[in-house]
Amino acid sequence: MKIEVIKKEENLLEFYLEGEDHTFANLLVETLRENPHVKFTAYTIEHPITMARKPRFRVVTDGEITPEEALEEAAKKIFERAKEVLEAWEKAVKS
């Protein structure tokens, strides 16, 4: 995974997330949307063949937090949810 920043302003961040596809992109956008300070977030895959594993994201916040802070919070939430799934799986397998 590699992040390539395209545009960075006070409350706006646009970037490519190389090496990912719709699976992680959807998860990240949905998690960002849970944050009340995120006013807009979306991603697009600019070309289905040449850019299939390079979604372009746009994150806009209300100014209370930066887009970078929103992304950090979202990443932490995703990590915690993954841990919960793993723990539930381990518990189910032991039963």
UniProtKB/Swiss-Prot annotation:
Keywords assigned by UniProt, alphabetized: Cytoplasm, DNA-directed RNA polymerase, Nucleotidyltransferase, Transcription, Transferase
Pfam families reported for this sequence: RNA_pol_L_2
Class of this enzyme: transferase
Main location: cytoplasm
Enzyme Commission code: 2.7.7.6
Matching InterPro entries: RBP11-like, RBP11-like_dimer, RNA_pol_Rpb11_13-16kDa_CS, Rpo11-like
Gene Ontology CC: cytoplasm; DNA-directed RNA polymerase complex
Subcellular location: Cytoplasm
SUPFAM superfamilies: RBP11-like subunits of RNA polymerase
Catalytic activity: RNA(n) + a ribonucleoside 5'-triphosphate = RNA(n+1) + diphosphate
Any one Gene Ontology BP term: DNA-templated transcription
Signal peptide annotation: none
Gene Ontology MF terms in the entry: DNA binding; DNA-directed RNA polymerase activity; protein dimerization activity
Quaternary structure and interacting proteins, as annotated: Part of the RNA polymerase complex.
Family to which this protein belongs: Belongs to the archaeal Rpo11/eukaryotic RPB11/RPC19 RNA polymerase subunit family.
Function: DNA-dependent RNA polymerase (RNAP) catalyzes the transcription of DNA into RNA using the four ribonucleoside triphosphates as substrates.
Annotated PANTHER family: DNA-DIRECTED RNA POLYMERASE I,II,III (PTHR13946), DNA-DIRECTED RNA POLYMERASES I AND III SUBUNIT RPAC2 (PTHR13946:SF28)
HAMAP family linked: RNApol_arch_Rpo11
The protein's name: DNA-directed RNA polymerase subunit Rpo11
Organism of origin: Pyrococcus furiosus (strain ATCC 43587 / DSM 3638 / JCM 8422 / Vc1)
Gene, per the UniProt record: rpo11
